[in-house]
Amino acid sequence: MKKENIRIVFMGTPEFAVESLKALVENGYNVVAVVTQPDKPVGRHQEQLQPSPVKLYALEHNLPVLQPVKMKDADFIEELRSYKADMQVVVAFRMLPEIVWSMPRLGTFNVHAALLPQYRGAAPINWAVINGETETGVTTFFLDKDIDTGRIILQKPFAIPDTADVEYVYDGLMYLGAKIAMETIDLIASKLPEDSLDNVDFSAVLDGISAPQVCEDAELHHAPKIFKETCEINWNQSAKKVYDFVRGLSPYPGTWSTLCSIEDNGVKPLIMKVYKTDKSDRTSVGTPGTLVVEKTRLYVNTSDNLLELLDIQLTGKKRMDVRSFLNGFKDIEKYLFQTE
């Protein structure tokens, strides 16, 4: 069947999802509607409403937009059914109830930013970098009742350089995700008859192009949602662990640590965000969290080696390189990072 004859409802919210929607629209796929989150209140008094990146793109291209507060809302379900989608494509969206994902006859597939079954969860890109992985990728799979466990359709790997932060990996997987979304639709279309879908055994077709997730004996890494407390640096770990941790959360939301005065002089602790570090083969010369200042360079002792800080930001100040920070913060030797 030609791709133009498959009616697609696209579901997504952030910039990551826009690239996939854009690829479908620009390459002639038949996107009949878009589902995204409701506009979010922003501003000091929450008086303004900000549409999602996906909504903005959809409106620019005259695509109908649905923004349900609750995915089981009867009016939303009725409106969704009215588009008579053959297939639903999900990229960076919320959990879907069965009444939604089971609606189209060609199923609902998700583009997940990891090589499933590894890194099931809300933050797969972050956790892959945090764990020091050298490879991740994207997976398309059919949604089912459990999170990120459905039958796998296609997978594509993506190499993670040792110096890459999560922004680099995010961008790479965003474009790779758009490519695999199109290839998945093309694969499904290639297994369908040219004329009519009336007498097609859809279960047989979809099972024929997908396979159950196989866990074997490998340790499964999970990708839970990132919270502020998740981002606190533990200096009692190795320099490599801290280095990867910073990469995996930079530039957003950013890791942080509490800078405390060594002396009991009533000086208030400071919160420092750390955006970039560099590994060192020099052995630590003090307890974890204590600082080593060498002219324009700043190091932190970890459980094994010194870790150099390169790009930081104190609360209420602008982000800056360490050289600029040291020029304006003359008493840094009197501080250390909290480790408890």
Label the model's feature ranges.
Residues 1-45:
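N-terminal Rossmann-like dinucleotide-binding module
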Residues 6, 27-30, 87-222, 229:
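Donor/substrate-binding cores of folate-linked one-carbon enzymes
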Residues 13-16, 69-72, 92-95, 280:
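Short beta->alpha connector loops
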Residues 18, 51, 73-77, 94, ...:
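Structural motif corresponding to alpha-helix initiation and N-cap regions
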Residues 41-84:
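N-terminal glycine-/serine-/threonine-rich beta1-alpha1-beta2 phosphate-ribose binding loop
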Residues 210-340:
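Internal anion-binding site segments
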